[in-house]
Amino acid sequence: MAVSDLSHRFEGESVGRALELVGERWTLLILREAFFGVRRFGQLARNLGIPRPTLSSRLRMLVEVGLFDRVPYSSDPERHEYRLTEAGRDLFAAIVVLMQWGDEYLPRPEGPPIKLRHHTCGEHADPRLICTHCGEEITARNVTPEPGPGFKAKLASS
């Protein structure tokens, strides 16, 4: 199958499947808060200004799909905190890329609201996607999508 054949939609595409789980505004903001250390329901509700029923629903879904673990931290009264699982932590790069895009294309006059300081060197980080084989930065201009082992072309409806 030629590379140009990938320009149409296809069944089971990874971005679409991922967005079914995390593509909603509140879900992404809950993930952002979790990456910055917020674990408790009340603090999430306050920081985000999210309606409590909406927060409950999103957290329940995030636990069900395996992005968070619900862990008790108090027995009297019973209270839980929400900790990112490995799958949840692996979404960090996606959140950072969205944050960088917002800083670049929807800038605030006073500058970025959040900067990331790299623990190893102590400098503000400017994260990039890097090829693990050659070390070159990956952009939309220097990669080509190819069918992977899970590729299935979506049949056009008649």
From Swiss-Prot:
A Pfam family that the UniProt record links to this protein: HxlR
InterPro entries (alphabetical): ArsR-like_HTH, HTH_HxlR, WH-like_DNA-bd_sf, WH_DNA-bd_sf
Keyword Transcription included in the entry's annotation: yes
PANTHER family registered for this protein in UniProt: TRANSCRIPTIONAL REGULATOR, MARR FAMILY, TRANSCRIPTIONAL REGULATORY PROTEIN
A molecular function (GO) term: DNA-binding transcription factor activity
Organism: Mycobacterium tuberculosis (strain ATCC 25618 / H37Rv)
Xref: SUPFAM superfamilies: Winged helix' DNA-binding domain (SSF46785)
Keywords for the protein's UniProt record, in alphabetical order: DNA-binding, Transcription, Transcription regulation
Name of the protein: Uncharacterized HTH-type transcriptional regulator Rv3095
Gene Ontology terms: cellular component: protein-DNA complex
GO biological process: regulation of DNA-templated transcription
Domain (HTH hxlR-type): residue spans on this chain: 13-110
